[in-house]
Each structure stands twice: as C-alpha cells, then as structure tokens.
C-alpha cells in the first residue's frame, strides 16, 4: 500500500508545515533511470559522483591485472606484489604498513582447499623458485609500464633468503584467515574487523561471500580471484564491482611525518604510488573482461589497466 511506504510517510511529514524542508543524501542515485531522473531533476543541490571522488584522489587507484595463470602462480604473484608494497613502505620509513590480500573463491570447499595449497606454496618458497617465477613473469610482460618491472627489479636487488624468510613469517598459518566458517564471528569477531590495527597479524583472507556486504578494511591492496570460471554473467561481475569498490577505500598512512587522506604519488617518480593502488587479479578472457568493465562503469568505479601508462623519457640538456 502506497500510504504505508517510507516515501509517503516523509511526504506527509513535509506537508504538515509549509516551512518544513528535507535534505536527502545518497551515494546510489540512478539519474539515468527515467522515473528517478524526472523526480530529482529540480531537486539536486550538489552532485559528487564516485568517479569524480576517485579522480580527485580520495580512494586508492584501482588497477586491473589480467593474466591467464594457474592458481598457484596467481597466488604467488599476489604474495610477491603484497610484500613488495611492504618493502617499499619500509624503504621510505613508513612503519606498521601491513597490506592485506583477499583470495576470493565461488565455493567454500575450493576456498579451504586453496588455503591449504597456499600454505604449502609459502612453505616451499626458495630463492631459486622465486627467481624462476619472476623470470617467467618478465618474459610474459608486454608493456614497459607494468608494475611488475619495478617488482622484478626490487627483488633482483634483494637478499632473497632474507625476503623469503620474512614472507614465510608474515604468511604463516596463524596469519591466514578463512571467513567461510559459520561460527567465525562468534569465535573471533575482532580479527576480520580490525585488519588495519598494527597488532593484528593477518596478511591474507580467504572468502566466498561473507565479505561482499558491510566489510570495510582500508589496507586491502590485492583482490585475487582463484579457481574462477570464464563466466560473463552480469550478476557475478556486478558483485565483483561492489567488492572492488570496497577495496578501493583509501588507507591514510603517514609519510614524512604527515598523514594524508588523498593520494599523493600518482605522478611521483617515487615507487610510493603502489601504496595507493588496489590491484584486482583476474583472468584475461575477452567476454568476461567486457562484462566486468560494464559492471565497473555502471558502479561508477574508475579503473586502470596495469601497463596501460606511457613511459616518459626525460631529455637532458
């Protein structure tokens, strides 16, 4: 009954006094919808869309990493990129920086199996296996601006025995969280909702659907689709777009004694821009990518392709 709707109730309250006014705030108004557009055409006081919000630097910069890889290689990619961020933070005196990875599956059984596979992968890491993985990665790169060039260069100049020891400590079984257990929130509601705290050791989260709604974590930097199917379902990509939007929230870390709530390094020569980027690791399948981009566009999420930038060469005078 229309008389019982929230909208009708508000209108009735407004009509009680001629000087009543209503201010409405929303992040999801669909002005492209004809009915909604007609209703709000003369009522919008100020419009600040998500895409503009992201363009103005109030979010992480969302980067798509598309590759046809097996799950093991994809998980190792995410770990090496995540640890690269931590190394860059340490190089620049940024303390307590702990980037989190989300491994997203479509079935609980797969998520649990992949967590076990992940633990085995971390335990089996050696300097030789990392060098081999990065050498294969370098051969596959088709762009001079891919983040992987910097990642490969950083590890090439590092003591891999030490780095791998740090990775194995950071990603040990105690620092992995599987949120598919029905009793998780009763057991330990704190771990999932305090990932930004320095005393929370979790570096990787394995999930199916529990983090799609109402989960806000600012230090999520990598979202990895594992055992994904080459589906071009709009419903599925809409859900992914929503998750990407959540992961894009900016993490206001302190650098050079100053805390910022907007991006500072988009155009900087420093490697610090990676601390302001969310990487979404997914398959390189044309139909799926087309549908994903449509969902991201519909959600007003500004995305960039890894390696789509331009290499600038400065000329010395």
Which residue stretches match the model-derived regions?
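Helicase-associated low-complexity regulatory tails and linkers flanking the ATPase motor
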Residues: 1-25, 30-204, 218-222, 228-317
């Amino acid at each position: 009954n229309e008389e019982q709707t929230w909208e009708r109730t508000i209108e009735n309250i407004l009509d009680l006094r001629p000087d009543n006014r209503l201010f409405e705030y929303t992040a999801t108004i669909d002005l492209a919808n004809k009915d909604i557009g007609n209703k709000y055409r003369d009522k919008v006081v100020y419009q600040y869309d998500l895409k503009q919000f992201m363009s103005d630097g109030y979010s992480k910069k969302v980067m798509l990493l598309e590759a046809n890889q097996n799950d093991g290689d994809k998980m190792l990619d995410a770990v090496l990129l995540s640890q690269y961020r931590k190394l860059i933070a340490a190089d620049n005196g940024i303390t307590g920086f702990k980037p989190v990875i989300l491994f997203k599956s479509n079935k609980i059984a797969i998520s649990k199996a992949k967590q076990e596979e992940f633990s085995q992968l971390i335990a089996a890491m050696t300097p030789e296996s990392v060098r081999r993985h990065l050498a294969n990665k370098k051969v596959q790169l088709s762009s001079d601006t891919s983040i992987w060039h910097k990642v490969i260069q950083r590890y090439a100049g590092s003591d891999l025995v030490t780095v791998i020891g740090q990775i194995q400590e950071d990603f040990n079984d105690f620092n992995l969280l599987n949120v598919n257990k029905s009793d998780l929130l009763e057991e330990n509601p704190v771990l999932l909702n305090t990932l930004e705290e320095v005393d929370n050791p979790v570096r990787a989260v394995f999930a199916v659907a529990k983090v799609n709604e109402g989960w806000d974590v600012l230090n999520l930097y990598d979202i990895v689709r594992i055992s994904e199917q080459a589906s071009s379902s709009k419903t599925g990509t809409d859900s992914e777009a929503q998750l990407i939007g959540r992961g894009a929230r900016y993490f206001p870390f302190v650098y050079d004694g100053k805390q910022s709530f907007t991006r500072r390094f988009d155009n900087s020569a420093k490697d610090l821009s990676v601390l302001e980027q969310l990487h979404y690791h997914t398959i390189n399948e044309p139909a799926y990518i087309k549908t994903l981009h449509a969902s991201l566009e519909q959600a007003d999420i500004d995305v960039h392709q890894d390696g789509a930038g331009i290499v600038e060469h400065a000329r010395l005078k």
